[in-house]
Amino acid sequence: MAPVLENRRARHDYEILETYEAGIALKGTEVKSLRAGKVDFTGSFARFEDGELYLENLYIAPYEKGSYANVDPRRKRKLLLHKHELRRLLGKVEQKGLTLVPLKIYFNERGYAKVLLGLARGKKAYEKRREDKKEAVRRALEEL
């Protein structure tokens, strides 16, 4: 279960409350680009639309040998979850200030692409600064 790509920025910008594993519906050339690690999480998020969950603004680079089979790199991609998980998530996301952000994309042991979603609350700037200071102190103590 080695991660293809991890969204480290999300853990800095958001407080992660819960995590969920979801399948992701991809086209063939997207899988090839994903295996090559050509993914950018910047600005990506998950959103409900007509009772289904979609991952939006995730950039998967076009496969260089893909020709006409390549699709829009920032297209909406459907996330695959059980109905009871979708209902539970919908209730939580409707709360003010909570959002779903992708934390990690990887391939499971069966070779299927999975995305680890985090139910998150945005951090304020002063919270980020406080956390950065704590991390700097921890590193300084480790060096000694």
From Swiss-Prot:
Molecular-function GO term, any one: rRNA binding
Main location: cytoplasm
Gene Ontology, cellular component aspect: cytosol
Domain of life assignment: Bacteria
Subcellular location field: Cytoplasm
Family membership noted in the UniProt record: Belongs to the SmpB family.
Subunit structure: Binds tmRNA. Binds to both the 50S and 30S ribosomal subunits via rRNA contacts, bridges tmRNA binding to stalled ribosomes.
Entry protein name: SsrA-binding protein
Naturally occurring in which organism (per UniProt): Thermus thermophilus (strain ATCC 27634 / DSM 579 / HB8)
